[in-house]
Amino acid sequence: MAFLEFNNVSKGYPGVQALANVSFTVEKGVVHGLMGENGAGKSTLIRVLSGDQAADGGNIFIDGEEQKYTSVRDAFHAGIVVIHQELQLVPELTVAENLWLGRFPAKGGIIHLKTLIETVRAKLEEIGIDVDPSTKVSSLSIGARQMIEIAKAVMLDARVIALDEPTSSLSSRESEILFSLIARLKARGAVILYVSHRLDEIFRLCDSLTVLRDGKLAAHHPKIAETTREQIISEMVGREISNVWGWRERALGDNRLEVKGLSGPRLHTPISFSVRQGEILGFFGLIGAGRSEMARLLYGADARHRGEVTIDGVAVSPNNPKVAIKAGMVLCPEDRKFDGIVQGRSIEENIAISSRRHFSRFGILKPKTEAAQADRFIAKLRVRTPSRRQDIVNLSGGNQQKVILGRWLSEQGIKVLVIDEPTRGIDVGAKSEIYDILYELAAGGVAIVVISSELPEVMGICDRIIVMCQGRVAANVARPDFDERSILTAALPDKNAAGSI
């Protein structure tokens, strides 16, 4: 008998049918994969399961009992825990307080912090997570925060655990800890719904698989061993994708961006590099290698200690992002939710926010011009939405990334694009569309810096790769010399290479 059952679950929003009569079952003690393009309905299904949103129709059964909860709290008490891609921790509370939030150990109404911290410390050590429980969550890396979310599910003894892109911010070591935790939960009899775009992980961890497309059930595989990667990709996108990367050779111009001796608070060893007109330069390294820190220094988001930056031979001193933008340099940040999109605002507003000075006269906005621009970029970038007025938080990760790119494409005179983790949490179909946008920009002479923790991505789309390790430049590899083993070796922490490029 199935332990978890979705029966004709449907959910609609204004102009969009997110789920249409989705039905499938999952056995007890099974890791079940959930795949589909961004916008396929995966996140909506998880929200319905978690009680965050109510279904318009259909039923959910756990161990034969219909679930009629109407809130996240009800689902929580039913043994359902969801770990979202957008983490739900409270930044200003400690690790221990977050893990015990809503169920603090108390006596006579008094919370015993010492007991709280020591209990959490023992549990974290038991499951192999090396984090001080008295540390505030705000001081932790994204990867460490993800591990704390996962630890919460383990401590709650949940019956059903949904993990949404759980390794997107984890190092290799942290991912291995996660995989061992999943094995422990599986052995305990829990159902794990594993949402991921990483086929390697799906085939390694999952026993069965469901594929959604356009809110409908595209395929259900009770035994994942009986399917293939090619079949799954075809089921996801409804078409064959022979080459996701599609690298395109193009003529490169003179140096457009030159960086000499750049350093800052979290990038102690000065680094130097250049990017030519039309070139796509990749930065690869493990988590903590200093890639994102370099990008923030370059863009003026963080104060630099020293260093020279020139664009088309003109010296630029980006001590804040406004200066960088004025000089023609823009950044698509690593964390789309907190640093990229403006939550609670429409797609139109998010596209126009950096260029509104072009759509105003004497400080008065021109709504029709702004709306026309939004419609143009929604069509050009193939943003899937019923309306430009839709709140951007309701878009999938891939469509949010397109809107951020649209924002900068609307900025006149863009010369340098720095894009950090361009396709994190984005499905294979949307990845291909993002790469098309980057190739088009490069063909127009824009110098592009791509920062990615996915080696196949930088090898697939970049003309050159700079490998970073512990805040230093460890290697500079031209496309004819791309070799996965040598690039990974250069990224390992026991290397000490540094210098100019």
Swiss-Prot record:
Chief site of localization: membrane
Q: Assembly and partners?
A: The complex is composed of two ATP-binding proteins (AraG), two transmembrane proteins (AraH) and a solute-binding protein (AraF).
Q: Name one Pfam family in it.
A: ABC_tran
Instruction: Tell me the Gene3D superfamilies matching this sequence.
Output: P-loop containing nucleotide triphosphate hydrolases
The record's function comment reads: Part of the ABC transporter complex AraFGH involved in arabinose import. Responsible for energy coupling to the transport system.
Query: What is the recorded name of this protein?
Result: Arabinose import ATP-binding protein AraG
UniProt subcellular location = Cell inner membrane
Which keywords does this chain's UniProt record carry?
A: ATP-binding, Cell inner membrane, Cell membrane, Membrane, Nucleotide-binding, Repeat, Sugar transport, Translocase, Transport
Q: Which family does it belong to?
A: Belongs to the ABC transporter superfamily. Arabinose importer (TC 3.A.1.2.2) family.
SMART domains (alphabetical): AAA (SM00382)
Q: Which domain of life is it from?
A: Bacteria
One GO term describing the cellular component = plasma membrane
Give the residues the record marks as binding ATP: G36, E37, N38, G39, A40, G41, K42, S43
Q: Which reaction does it catalyse?
A: L-arabinose(out) + ATP + H2O = L-arabinose(in) + ADP + phosphate + H(+)
Give the organism's phylogenetic lineage. Bacteria, Pseudomonadati, Pseudomonadota, Alphaproteobacteria, Hyphomicrobiales
Q: Residues in domain ABC transporter? A: 4-239, 252-495
